[in-house]
């Protein structure tokens, strides 16, 4: 028997992929791929393939920028390739 912890991430990813593409879906995917610390330190909006990330300060901005290639790859896996074409990160 396959453990649930091995099947669940794939099942959730499949459900997310099949849901209609909305800004809320992209925001949910963001929280899922970056984890609780970055999710809590940022807010996002999405449109025209651009994910706009508002970080609460410069250190979080740098962290997101540093991790942007990995974040994009994970977003591509959840949302489909090129849904997020660019991540624009700014700080308050």
Question: Could you tell me what each predicted segment is?
Answer:
Residues 48-68, 90:
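A short interface-forming secondary-structure element
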Residues 35-40:
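Short amphipathic beta-strand starts and helix->beta connectors
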Residues 1-32, 43-48, 69, 79-92:
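N-terminal presequence-like segments and adjacent domain-start helices
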């Amino acid at each position: 028997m396959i453990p649930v912890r091995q099947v669940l991430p794939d099942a959730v990813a499949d459900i997310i992929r099949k849901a209609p593409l909305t800004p809320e879906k992209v925001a949910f995917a963001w929280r899922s791929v970056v984890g609780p610390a970055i999710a809590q330190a940022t807010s996002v909006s999405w449109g025209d393939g651009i994910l706009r990330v508002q970080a609460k300060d410069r250190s979080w901005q740098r962290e997101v920028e540093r991790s942007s290639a990995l974040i994009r790859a994970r977003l591509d896996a959840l949302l489909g390739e090129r849904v997020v074409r660019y991540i624009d990160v700014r700080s308050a």
